């Protein structure tokens, strides 16, 4: 199928067309660290599970490729590759040639592409042409069926042939190009049986016309193509509708911005050409093009895309802003801190597309089935033809039955069973403020029966307040703040905020996750953290969190803190209970503090004073007991248990390592994102199983009917197209059911009490 790429994209295909230079591909790739890079390519003529297997197989055969994944919904392939293999610098052009050798066009992905709209226009025009031709041929056929004489019948047959031929060539080019491309490279896809069926139907009709036969099936061949094109057009539209969350998010990024040069001159520059360090002017009413830091100006910023909150946030000099946020009231001068491809919007889009392309167990099964389905269909059609020839000896009837079998057994429904649900579910979760980093994570989340939550920053908002500052001397507070500067832990941040500006203390600094900070200075060894870490002993119990400042294990000061639970925490725990899920707390804080919070939230199982290793051990013990646990955590010390869990989640405020380790990231302050994500994932799993049942049930019923000769090619085309649309519409129920009956957002999910087991 031909698709028009943007002018920035250079097509790579057979026929000697120009391809991007190796250096261009290097610049377009993303550095992942560890000698790995990631490149995104568009593959506009990939349609089915066979295409996925072919492209991924061609790339994985390359020693430079670490992994490759095709996203059929966006028709893109993501390649993670090694910068060097055997001391030789990798040439990324090899990846494009490997794809082209399998018969697929490919070009560098450009965020500004609108090929989907062009394809939709081409499909609609093809539907119109085939529909017009089918209508006119049908009128001629009615005259023939009404008892026209032989000469008139032959004339009408020839007129029908002249109408059908160009219509099949023009409107059927989508199927013919794809089928020929597959056959030429020694493989099959779902368009091969369609092209065979349409061609055989037309060929048989032409043979009858030349031989002055009584019956011709030009109307059937063109009408068959008409219904097939309707199905493909609706499928394309439904996929686009399923991806509305991603396309809407992409539109939040402006095309460009005004860049201020050092000499004061201004230039409008495309967003892809903005580099870190550039000074930008963002006027009121404009969206922030890339992540940046405010150099001057004060304004209200709509950050709903970041945190889901409708209330504007005031930003001023020194504050950070994210790409896609809307500047409401005043002009801002920014310094870009990231390129467009590394900014917030690009990161979120990447997460959602990773969710779409994730290889969950069901999707692997569907892809494997679709890969072997096409050869099986051809064999079945051949056996059907041979069988009817042996039974009746009528070539025409045997051929018609074989054509019907070719059409009715198209694996479209099976290939769509999983990915379309993942697309809709990822979009639904995004609308609820939850980012999915891997499509398989939704499947794992639907299986959990236990939720283990960290305390500070997860069950609480992670902004503790120092409550006994009046009891601590300014000198000790300043010393503690100078040590706390080296940590992002919420308690360290609270000490810094209470002390004001503080210069970092000089010395050999070491942060021990789950314990505290140690600084070796000329005066001795300062420690700031838990009592056991700082002074090697226990102290009086209290219901407040504390941090001890010590010098050579001698206590200098005790800092006490209060932290507020996250909004809707208790309601979220109750919602988890209604889902039949047990809850527990994993915390490194003192037992009295954890017990008090657990009691207030109605959680009976809790663990206190745990090290990162002990948290992993608790999670492993739950797994050994047969439980599948979701771990929700935010800190550096939570990263090991997040990776060890069956599935994991972190708030957007989490430390970078925590967000990277988690499978889900929730953007809102409310903990209601947790039951919302579980409910959505469970419902998505139900729809996937339903889609499998629909696809398999369709084949179990339709294939025997076609083999027995009870379905004409036209009926087969209608049935095949309908099966694909049923699967897509069933997936779209996820949007309607959650919005109407199971909570439109995490907040309404909790307040309506709509979570059901």
From Swiss-Prot:
It is a multi-pass membrane protein. GO terms for cellular component: plasma membrane. A metal cation binds at residues 48, 51. The chain crosses the membrane at residues 122-143, 159-178, 186-206, 219-239, 369-391, 399-416, 689-708, 714-732. Residues 37-107 form the HMA domain. The keyword Ribonucleoprotein does not apply. It is found in: Cell membrane. GO terms for biological process: nitrogen fixation. Residues 144-158, 207-218, 392-398, 709-713 are extracellular. NCBIfam families: ATPase-IB1_Cu, ATPase-IB2_Cd, ATPase-IB_hvy, ATPase_P-type. This is Nitrogen fixation protein FixI.
